């Protein structure tokens, strides 16, 4: 029963993704006025991406599909911008989820996943090199290939072990209050929208990686079509 439910969640997420926002910096951009409707749309867009990621086997493939569907880059292909020379020891909980002892070597990889000029997520990744092929290890150590693409031959599946929202576009009590009057300001969006912690498994259900993915406001970097209800504001 789980796969049909996941497919329905993904289909619903991709349909909802058609509602759209705009640009980064400190405000979301001219396409995102700070209005009640805009906040409802932002909520739908963020939650649709969240649902698509939770239902997916590969965050890399999902983000590439998001970038392509929203025309965010001429070549919608994800690239991992590596932060080289950094290390972060795995916690005992991570080692337990990966089914490795305290002396088993783990490798750490921190990347920013970008589509064109848009950094869509930041990822901290701990993986067990002995459970990958030599070629996979070489690719991960020497190239900017996203992790999901590098290990795709393992028949990867994901199990989410934690999810945390970092932004709620609608104010507390919005469902019981009258909507505020629209204004000519732009919607302020924080740097980070939500994060997931997931364990990756081979096709034989052997855990080989744990990743913490934090999704940024750049996922909203696409053109939001004007709405009839948008306030008539002077051009900046």
For the regions a language model picked out, list residue spans one by one:
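Intrinsically disordered, low-complexity segments enriched in proline/serine/threonine
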Residues: 6, 23-26
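Bacterial N-terminal signal peptides
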Residues: 11-21
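N-terminal domain-onset segments
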Residues: 26-108, 112-114, 118-179, 184-194, ...
């Amino acid at each position: 029963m789980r796969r049909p439910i996941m497919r329905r969640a993904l289909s619903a997420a991709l349909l909802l993704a058609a509602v759209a926002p705009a640009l980064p910096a400190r405000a979301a951009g001219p396409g995102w006025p700070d209005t009640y409707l805009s906040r409802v749309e932002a909520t739908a867009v963020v939650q649709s991406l969240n649902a698509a990621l939770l239902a997916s086997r590969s965050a890399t493939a999902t983000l590439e599909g998001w970038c392509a569907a929203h025309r965010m880059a001429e070549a919608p292909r994800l690239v991992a911008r590596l932060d080289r020379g950094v290390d972060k020891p795995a916690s005992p909980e991570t080692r337990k989820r990966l089914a490795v002892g305290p002396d088993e070597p783990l490798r750490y990889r921190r990347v920013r996943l970008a589509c064109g000029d848009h950094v869509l997520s930041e990822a901290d990744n701990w993986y067990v090199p002995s459970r990958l092929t030599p070629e996979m290890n070489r690719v991960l150590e020497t190239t900017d290939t996203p992790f999901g693409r590098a290990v795709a031959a393992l028949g990867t599946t994901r199990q989410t072990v934690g999810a945390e929202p970092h932004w709620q576009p609608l104010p507390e009590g919005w469902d019981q209050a009258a909507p505020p009057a629209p204004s000519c300001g732009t919607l302020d969006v924080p740097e980070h929208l939500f994060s997931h912690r997931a364990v990756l498994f081979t096709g034989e259900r052997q855990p080989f990686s744990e990743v913490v993915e934090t999704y940024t406001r750049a996922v909203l970097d696409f053109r939001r079509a004007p709405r009839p209800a948008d306030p008539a504001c002077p051009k900046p």
